[in-house]
């Protein structure tokens, strides 16, 4: 969430939203007795604990988070922020993405990207409160817990904030890299995209279209149209984003035209220039976007995988790409 605020100040187009701060997380853990319960569970785990023990500890702690209600005062503050967001978005119950953001998650060295949860399509104040609480609990996923145990990191030194951001109505979305994620080439921007929301892309559930653009002259070097069989769409009845079969008319249709490719490229190169290092970015082309408008950026992180510039095997490997980029996602009804 801090990166989105920074990008907004740098005049990058980002969705509206608000943050539930680290202070709010600490306050909830102290007031609800979670601090004591967490310490009790973790104190019984050695640094080399097996995954069965780690998963059991994770389940116990996450269940404790679900059982502890947010205090009336804190819940009122979060509810007020959500209601203000609804006013700004001109929507009675604006659908949101509720995203975890822990200390160190965006560090290129720590490579924490993807270790915590995101809940998509969350609308209504009570559902937002439930999703915030679940995001807090995701600090203790088995993967996150095992990582901290191996590296001697205390959960007290790695508190979690939560971003509640407007869920942009996506025509198309995906990921983009300011360095080739497979070959390591720094002379191009690599774009992967599909129809709808980007979860099917980052989870490796769909083979996305693939584009490469030269940084020197913004020339489109290649565009491969993939056969896309799954789409992430908003289920209004369930109140969440779900994966469904791609409509037949879109399976083999090119996702981005040249103008849209150029808009994504422009955003990615601007973000790389702002930070001064290679980045990977989540982008969304809104249904309401007009030609010439910027695309919306919903996440930007340092590239966490360093690879040599050498020829790579041909073909798209969704599992490999998801491993490089994916972040945990769950629908929250």
What are these regions (language model features)?
Residues 99, 110, 119-121, 130-132, ...:
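Beta-strand scaffold of nucleotide-dependent catalytic cores
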Residues 314-318:
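Flexible linker/loop signature enriched in Pro/Ser/Thr and Pro/Gly
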